[in-house]
């Protein structure tokens, strides 16, 4: 009752103020409406508030999918490398009939598997959530998913796991202890948050943007599910990820040849 009375008195106060302005031959709109708000997408086209909210929520959802890969990969890499270095068990493992490259490749692929599982679980939950919301909220009534978009989305999630797992392995390999590895992995976690802040900025997405790891994954996933994607940008994202992943694997093999990296304590 109190809130209702306060709202009524506030409206009545505004009404009396407008009457005084009109009596003085002053248009109230010229006094109170000093600026207008227009919401536009990254292409500069005006969009409705509901469309903006849906795009923002989807951007945050896909960012969390990439973050899931990062968290899983960093934790796995920390356990597989930093913890074993701290406990001195890598020397024991290398007494087995395997090369250093085989050992590192196995740990890297384990990171990829864990990252892929985490991302696909998040991906499925996101799609299911939006599908359910479509039947419950007017805000999502225009949301639709094609089979092609789902397939490409799965491909992007798996490819992102290859790249992010490689970066996580490289970052944590320099650490001597579990705590150092966790601290180093936080850098990668912070990078994955960038797409959320980028969604608030007004800028034009160019072709170069799809060569930037992490940022391109969130963008291409968002475009896939808003129906605004181009196959050229999709191919650039896939191609650049493959190239980056190969370079990271090559650098890992070269880096882990050093005994200081393998057995630092």
Task: State what each model feature region is.
Residues 105-134, 163-164, 168:
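Hydrophobic alpha-helical transmembrane segments that constitute the membrane-spanning cores
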Residues 1-72:
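Transport-system extracytoplasmic interface segments
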Residues 175-211:
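Transmembrane helix segments
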Residues 203-227, 235:
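Short hydrophobic, aromatic-rich alpha-helical segments embedded in or entering the lipid bilayer
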Residues 48, 126-152, 227-228:
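Membrane-interfacial helix-loop-helix connectors in multipass membrane proteins
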Residues 64-89, 169, 173:
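A hydrophobic alpha-helix feature that marks transmembrane segments and, especially
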Residues 80-84, 170-176, 225, 242-265:
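Junction motif at the cytosolic side of a transmembrane helix
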Residues 144-175, 196, 240-249:
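Hydrophobic alpha-helical transmembrane segments of polytopic membrane proteins
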């Amino acid at each position: 009752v109190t809130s209702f009375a306060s709202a009524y008195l506030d409206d009545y106060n505004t009404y009396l103020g407008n009457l005084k302005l009109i009596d003085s031959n002053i248009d109230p709109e010229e006094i109170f409406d000093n600026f207008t708000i227009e919401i536009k997408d990254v292409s500069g086209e005006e969009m409705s508030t509901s469309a903006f909210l849906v795009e923002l929520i989807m951007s945050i959802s896909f960012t969390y999918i990439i973050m899931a890969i990062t968290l899983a990969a960093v934790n796995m890499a920390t356990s597989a490398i930093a913890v074993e270095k701290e406990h001195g068990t890598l020397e024991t493992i290398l007494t087995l009939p395997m090369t250093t490259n085989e050992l590192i490749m196995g740990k890297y692929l384990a990171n990829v598997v864990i990252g892929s599982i985490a991302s696909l679980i998040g991906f499925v939950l996101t799609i299911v959530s939006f599908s359910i919301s479509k039947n419950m909220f007017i805000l999502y009534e225009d949301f639709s998913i094609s089979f092609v978009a789902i397939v490409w989305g799965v491909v992007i999630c798996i490819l992102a796991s290859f790249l992010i797992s490689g970066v996580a392995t490289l970052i944590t390999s320099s650490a001597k202890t579990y705590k150092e590895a966790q601290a180093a992995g936080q850098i990668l976690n912070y990078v994955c948050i960038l797409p959320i802040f980028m969604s608030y900025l007004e800028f034009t997405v160019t072709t170069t943007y799809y060569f930037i790891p992490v940022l391109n994954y969130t963008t291409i996933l968002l475009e896939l599910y808003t129906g605004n994607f181009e196959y050229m940008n999709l191919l650039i994202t896939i191609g650049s990820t493959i190239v980056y992943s190969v370079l990271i694997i090559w650098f890992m093999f070269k880096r882990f040849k050093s005994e200081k990296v393998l057995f630092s304590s």
